[in-house]
Amino acid sequence: ALNLNARNFEVELRRAAEKLENGMSGFLTQPVLSAQAVGNLKKARETLGGRAKILAGILPVVSQRNAIFMENEVNGIHVDETIIQKFEGLDRAAGEELGLEVSVQAAKAAAPYADGFYLMTPFNRVALMERLIARLRTEVTD
């Protein structure tokens, strides 16, 4: 794992380098849901170079309640406050639509620094993930 949201990302990078020295060949990141996470992903790519594959985590946020829960209760996940605010007052359909857009934008921002993505399905919403995969295939990947 590579926690892009670690309070002291330099320590996280040192741990990643140690993991590489001990045979690690790739990393899965925490979900990319902030500019800080993208910046740390860039720093990880620069520091670790081509020595390891990095798969950026993409987890669609589907409601304000979901975003607040992840921000406050899930260790290692940081949801940018602007994202949390955008979900205010949205119904389920609008929340899913916004979550889809946020996820596509996060993937676009992370793409230059990642070797690929791994997707986390929120609340068994398979149809949402099908839509996300289709968008990523046409808008983000080659």
Locate predicted features.
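Conserved, mostly hydrophobic/aromatic
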Residues: 19, 23, 56, 117
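Catalytic beta/alpha-barrel core
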Residues: 25-35, 97, 118-121
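Active-site glycine-rich loop that binds ribose-phosphate moieties when present
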Residues: 7-22
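Active-site capping/gating regions of soluble enzymes
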Residues: 109, 116-135, 139
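Active-site-adjacent beta->alpha loops and helix N-cap segments on the catalytic face
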Residues: 7-11, 31-47, 124-135
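Active-site pocket-lining/capping segments in soluble small-molecule metabolic enzymes
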Residues: 1-6, 47-106, 123, 137-142
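A structural motif corresponding to the C-terminal end of an alpha-helix
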Residues: 22, 105-116
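Surface-exposed cleft-lining segments at the edges of enzyme active sites
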Residues: 1-5, 24-29
